[in-house]
Amino acid sequence: MSVKNGLVQLENLTSMENLSVDEVMGLIKRASAFKAGKADFALDEQTFASNLFFENSTRTHHSFHIAERKLGLDVLEFDAQASSISKGETLYDTVLTLDALGVDICVIRSGVEHYYEELVNSDNIHCAIVNGGDGSGQHPSQCLLDLMTIYEEFGKFEGLKIAISGDLTHSRVAKSNMMMLQKLGARLYFTGPAAWYSEEFDDYGHYANLDRILPELDVHMLLRVQHERHDSGESFSKEGYHTHFGLTQERAKMLKPTAIIMHPAPVNRDVEIADSLVESPQSRIVQQMSNGVYTRMAILEAILAGKKAK
């Protein structure tokens, strides 16, 4: 991984741990250039991408597809139920096969954390791996689009007060963001049920009372309650969660006028956030979705640049 002549070069993108501040800023600025229509890009040769999603997805899956098409890539959509996965073939053997067929980039989402390790460490798999989310592990492309959205608003990260609120333990978005936001100089707070907080997060910020810190925040980043990753009896009722931990209309009045509201979506309206706030003037939730296409264009361009530089 490196930055040359202002362009990032990546072999793979699996975790925010693997990215430097320079690479992150390079990707954000390149995504902004794509958004502004000021980025020149042309493929040198036919390039194939395949999107392998083993967990449901709307935003990540479709924005990667659109990004790939905008860059001129040939996209092979992958249906796990119609593939040899349904016959017992492993993910490794599936990617090995796609690589042998000539696929250049595999975008993968899996419920298995760190699934990508055996793929990127294989001597026989040469296609680039882009992690579209691995269980409760990492979600680097979501983190980068979140960072782009924050940077568009404030033009900096240093000194910003940011709260990440909700289902922290089960959220790959939270883990990717806390890791990089701290590195970029933001001051982080974590709020939500104590049962969904881990002491390992103390390395990045502080567990806080939401009502006390709301007036100080520049960014309030809400997280979806991930019922599908909970043990039985671990979840709250929708009404109870919204009352005690959600961004209600009354709590939103405590935010500074310049503060922004974010959520990686899908949104559980009237659970994490009041329905009326999802598309409110302070919300950047729709902007995050739009930025996902441009961020993923920048990621794919960096992957292609990395392959070319080999």
Swiss-Prot record:
Which NCBIfam families would you find in this protein's record? asp_carb_tr (TIGR00670), PRK00856.1 (NF002032)
Q: What organism does the record attribute this protein to?
A: Lactococcus lactis subsp. cremoris (strain SK11)
Transferase as a keyword of this entry, yes or no, is: yes
At which positions is L-aspartate bound?
K87, R172, R224
Task: Write down the chemical reaction(s) this protein catalyses.
Answer: carbamoyl phosphate + L-aspartate = N-carbamoyl-L-aspartate + phosphate + H(+)
Q: Name one Pfam family in it.
A: OTCace_N
Q: What is this protein called?
A: Aspartate carbamoyltransferase catalytic subunit
Q: What class of enzyme is it?
A: transferase
Instruction: Mention one GO molecular function.
Output: aspartate carbamoyltransferase activity
What is the top-level taxon of the source organism?
Bacteria
